Amino acid sequence: MYLTDPIADMLTRVRNANAVMHEKVDIPHSKMKERIAEILKEQGYISNFKIVTDEGNKKNIRVYLKYAGKERVIKGLKRISKPGRRVYSSVDDMPRVLSGLGIAIVSTSKGIVTDKVARAEKVGGEVLAFVW
């Protein structure tokens, strides 16, 4: 299946699984999606993730979602920069999600990082998504 926007597909799968309180969700693998899952784990939005291979020898990322009792840890996921409308931000204009309570995932020349890391390293880039 061909996807126009694989990052939006990943975020939608996580959002939908989170909405119905699933324990885990499988996402087709790419290095960019793996790095986004890594950031979500580092920031405490998911409990874990691992790379699994299915019977067709295709790699998937299995994301284990995190809940605080019956409360969802991920309140929202939003795709910002889309294939039809790219959104770039300089270090000075880097957005703050919910006044710093959420994170922005940014693709920079130093890799895919959070908005806080991008500010610390003084680099701008493409704002991929907001998570809160």
Swiss-Prot record:
PROSITE patterns: RIBOSOMAL_S8 (PS00053)
UniProt keyword annotation of Ribonucleoprotein present: yes
Coiled coil (UniProt feature): none
Cystine residue pairs: none
Signal peptide: none
Gene3D superfamilies in UniProt: 3.30.1370.30, 3.30.1490.10
Function as written in the Swiss-Prot or TrEMBL entry: One of the primary rRNA binding proteins, it binds directly to 16S rRNA central domain where it helps coordinate assembly of the platform of the 30S subunit.
Oligomeric form and interacting partners: Part of the 30S ribosomal subunit. Contacts proteins S5 and S12.
Protein name: Small ribosomal subunit protein uS8
Organism: Fusobacterium nucleatum subsp. nucleatum (strain ATCC 25586 / DSM 15643 / BCRC 10681 / CIP 101130 / JCM 8532 / KCTC 2640 / LMG 13131 / VPI 4355)
